[in-house]
Design a protein with these regions (language model features):
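N-terminal acidic, glycine/proline-rich low-complexity segments
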Residues: 26-280
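Compositionally biased, low-structure terminal segments
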Residues: 5-6, 15, 25
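Bacterial Sec-dependent signal peptides at the C-terminal "C-region" and cleavage site
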Residues: 18-28
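Bacterial N-terminal signal peptides that target proteins for export
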Residues: 1-10
Length: 280
């Protein structure tokens, strides 16, 4: 190490050797086991349209190497007690995930049954379950209760991991359901994904981004065009929350700070870096 400090050229070479070609970090102790675990993203889509951008961002991550083989599933309509209208985006979920999504807005019980089956399959084969709580914890509470009823001997506090970044999401959940999730899962409250420089990525910006310069997959380009169109259509409409950054042509997929954290990619700085990293 003394030699490295004395020779700046060796120090630069050493730093380059530690940098992975793909741009992704290579953690020594990864949180998520890509070969065994299940990754769930629960979107509320009520009433902020940021979840619409987040759906496209989640699909982008799951399409990229080295994450394209991850077992994943999305849930729409995983909202809590907040007032206001839902943002319908079934065509986006279908384009993003195919059969890998469930509609809790239209049929809560069916969605619960579908996701519980996936969770049980993962747990029974030795994997853990990770939930990116992109909305409130009401659906997750029902899911954990269902798993406990089917697997009464399972310690859900060590096998089901829930990641939440938003104080507002927590305050908009049914209080007793949030408390249940916090007490019956491995619950992680991480820094807010709306800001940069706090330990997680800041995926909320008013800045326009030349995202098409970074994404090469035509399907992903179409997916983002659909997401942007839906978000613009419903943003601030009929009493829905007005997302300022989206209204001026920016981006808000702040919930994806949770997925970045789960996958040990929390060093990613902002939305522009996201597109450069995952759009390859």
């Amino acid at each position: 190490m003394r030699l490295l400090l004395q020779n700046p050229y060796l120090l630069i070479l050493f730093a380059l050797l530690l940098t992975t070609p793909s741009g992704f970090s290579q953690p020594t102790n990864p949180r998520f086991d890509a070969e065994a675990d299940l990754l769930l993203s629960h979107f509320d889509s009520k009433t902020d349209v940021d979840d619409i951008h987040s759906v496209a961002a989640f699909a982008t991550i799951m399409s990229s190497e080295p994450f394209s083989q991850i077992n994943h599933h999305a849930v729409a309509g995983a909202y809590g007690i907040q007032e206001g209208l839902y943002v319908p985006a079934n065509e986006l979920f279908e384009a993003a995930f195919g059969e890998r999504w469930s509609d809790a807005h239209t049929n809560f019980n069916q969605a619960l049954s579908e996701v519980a089956e996936l969770v049980s399959e993962t747990l029974e084969t030795g994997g853990d379950v990770w939930v990116a709580e992109c909305g409130q914890s009401d659906f997750t509470a029902a899911l954990v209760q269902e798993i406990q009823s089917v697997h009464p001997d399972l310690d859900t506090s060590s096998r089901i991991h829930v990641v939440q970044h938003s104080n507002w999401n927590e305050s908009s959940a049914t209080p007793e359901k949030l408390k249940f999730v916090q007490g019956n899962t491995d619950y992680h409250k991480i820094p807010d994904g709306n800001a940069v420089g706090n330990g997680t990525p800041g995926f909320n910006t008013a800045d326009s981004i030349d995202w098409k310069d970074s994404i090469s997959d035509p399907k992903l380009i179409s997916l983002w065009e659909t997401a942007i169109a839906i978000a613009n259509r419903y943003n601030g409409q009929e009493g829905r929350y007005l997302n300022h950054n989206i209204s001026v042509g920016g981006f808000d997929f702040s919930d994806m700070a949770e997925v970045a954290w789960i996958l040990n990619q929390e060093q990613m700085h902002n939305a522009e870096v996201f597109f450069i990293t995952f759009g390859k």
